[in-house]
Amino acid sequence: MKNLITGVAVSGLLAAVVSGQAAASKTVNGIQVSVAKIERMEKAALKDCPPGTNTVNAVQRPGDELAVVTVNFKVMPDFKPAMFKRPTATAADDKVYNTSVQFVEVGSVPEYSCQFIYRVPTGTKLKAFTVEGTTFDIAALDK
């Protein structure tokens, strides 16, 4: 009985740890992609991806907030240079949001992280992040 209780406790702890981790990685056009986190900010830099010299800032407006989705990228050996479209974020109500952040020279750096900024109504929960037709479930990351 004691082992059963310990097993249940460990399983619950493991589930809690896993739910707070990044969304599973997927390979998109020869690049391994994983969504690391979602943060809410009043101001955020609209840097290119991979991060470059773009210095424009996004600022929160009344009634809106900035949902910042951090995504990790790793260029795989089978990557072939290509233009990537701007990724989108989908809210729990199925509304799709666009970002101003754009991809520039995607394979120029072997590994990098980018922040994609989405202006959404206050309280909006994001459920999906889509890049090049590949969708990531991010609902567990949006707390």
Task: Identify the residue ranges that each predicted region occupies.
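Positively charged n-region of N-terminal signal peptides that target proteins for export
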Residues: 1-4
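Conserved functional micro-motifs across diverse proteins
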Residues: 7, 20-143
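Bacterial N-terminal signal peptides
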Residues: 7-16
